[in-house]
Every structure is written in C-alpha cells, then in structure tokens.
C-alpha cells in the first residue's frame, strides 16, 4: 500500500488464496509446488534436525514467527482491499464482497461491492450517497493476467481499462450509480522452473486432487489434542504430466457459493 505497486496486488492475491488450514491451527513453514510429502521429515531445507518438519502442517515449529503471525493473514488482506489516494481517490485494490464507507465534502458515501470473485469475474460496485453528487476518482486494480474485460458505469458505453495496472473513472457520482467490472477469466498454463507447468483460472492456482494418507499427531512437542500436527503422504497416483501447450476445458457445475462461518469452538 505504501508503494502503490500494481504487481504486488497479484502476488498478495495468490498468496491469500493458496492452501491454508481452514481453522488456522496448522501451517507450513515452507511450501513448494508439486510437493510429494508433507511430513515431519520431508523438508529439503532442514536447517539442522529441528527444521526437518518445516514442510509439514503443524501448529508450531522450531521458530515461532509463523505461528504467531498466521492469524493476521486475512485481517491484513481485508484492511487492504480498499485504499485511499490523493484528492479523495478511492481505490478498490483487492476484490471480494465488502463495503467501504467515507465522507467527502460533507456527503456520506457508501460503496457496496457484490461479487463471487475469485470464482467469478463479475464485480459490481453500488454507490449510496446521502447528499448531493460528489466528484470521486474511483480506481480499480486490473490484474496482470486479464486479457478481456468490460468496464461500465450505469450499463452505459464501456470504458477503457488497463490490464496489469489501475483504471480510474473520475466523475460526479450520485446516489444509485453502479460501476461494473466484468473480467473474462479463462484458464491458462504458465511455464515454471524445471519444466513445470502451472494451471490458473484467474487468480486461482489449480492442483490435482489425489487421495492422501493422513496421520494425526497429538503427542509431540508443540502439539496437542486441540492443536495436532499432520503427516500427509499420497495414497493414489500423483505422477501426472501436461503437454507443453495443453488444451484446457472448463466445466461449470452450477454450484452456488455461500459464506462459511467458522463456529466459535474452532475459531482461530
């Protein structure tokens, strides 16, 4: 947020949407693409015997920095979804269902963001003002992977956008105005180190769903019944490969998404 770097938004989004334990009670110190094992002895960067478990999901490691900070992840993410610029500029930097409130020249402004992003590329911003129209530079971050998108105000003529940058609509916004950003999220394959290929859909990184053996550990150092560690090994074939330029087909199951509230006993 200090740098205002457009590229950092893509990195931040990818990290936030990566693999985490849903109750935040276990984490990896190190993670790597195509990791075959996640056990107490699987780390390839051991840092001595105590560091061998750093690629496993555990509540704690030989150092405390990650365990003490992992719970900050989504509060930090949410606090940076909306940012401010100069001259009353409002910036939608990271997308997700949310609401932003401010006051400009005595007029209270509320912007409601409706979206299923990152599972849908349709993002709708609804403006509610309790007074006269006010001039607002309204800026949206357009991810670098975007090839096609449509940006409109009140369903009128599409506006220009800048992929991999920031697009600003500056106008006198009034109560009831609607800004829509519709991103065409296509699957794409990106080459990685050592002839690897990553498959993405928008900001989401896909992985093959393989069967797994899970050993729950409750009696080791820094583990308990409430905060166990896990040894995870594959229980089905994992050694799949992709051609250099794969053809990818998307199948929409029609499943509707809903917010999931973590119950009080397991809330981190």
Range-by-range predicted roles:
Residues 65, 74, 247-259, 263, ...:
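Accessory carbohydrate-recognition regions in carbohydrate-active enzymes
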Residues 28-30, 92, 183-253:
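Glycine/proline-rich low-complexity spacer/linker segments in large multi-domain proteins
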Residues 136-139, 169-184, 188-190:
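C-terminal beta-strand-rich structural cap/linker in extracellular carbohydrate-active enzymes
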């Amino acid at each position: 947020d200090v740098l205002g770097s457009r590229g950092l938004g893509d990195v931040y989004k990818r990290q936030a949407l990566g693999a985490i334990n849903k109750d935040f009670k276990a984490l990896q110190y190190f993670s790597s693409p195509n990791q075959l094992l996640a056990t107490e002895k699987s780390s390839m960067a051991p840092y001595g015997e105590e560091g061998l478990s750093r690629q496993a999901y555990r509540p704690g490691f030989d150092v405390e920095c990650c365990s003490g900070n992992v719970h900050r992840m989504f509060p930090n993410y949410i606090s940076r979804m909306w940012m401010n610029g100069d001259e009353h500029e409002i910036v939608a930097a990271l997308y997700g269902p949310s609401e932003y409130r401010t006051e400009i020249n005595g007029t209270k402004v509320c912007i409601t963001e409706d979206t299923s992003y990152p599972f849908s590329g349709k993002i709708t911003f609804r403006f509610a003002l309790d007074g006269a129209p006010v001039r607002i530079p309204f800026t949206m971050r357009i991810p670098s992977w975007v090839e096609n998108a449509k940006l409109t105000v009140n369903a009128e003529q599409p506006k220009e956008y800048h992929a991999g940058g920031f697009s600003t609509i500056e106008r006198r916004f009034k109560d009831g105005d609607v800004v829509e950003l519709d991103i065409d999220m296509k699957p794409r394959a990106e080459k990685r180190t050592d002839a690897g290929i990553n498959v993405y859909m928008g900001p989401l990184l896909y992985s093959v769903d393989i069967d797994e053996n899970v050993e729950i550990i409750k009696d080791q150092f820094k583990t308990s019944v409430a905060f166990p560690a896990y040894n995870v090994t594959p229980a089905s074939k994992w050694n799949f490969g992709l051609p250099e330029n794969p053809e990818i087909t998307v199948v929409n199951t029609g499943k509707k998404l809903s917010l999931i509230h973590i119950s009080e006993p397991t809330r981190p």
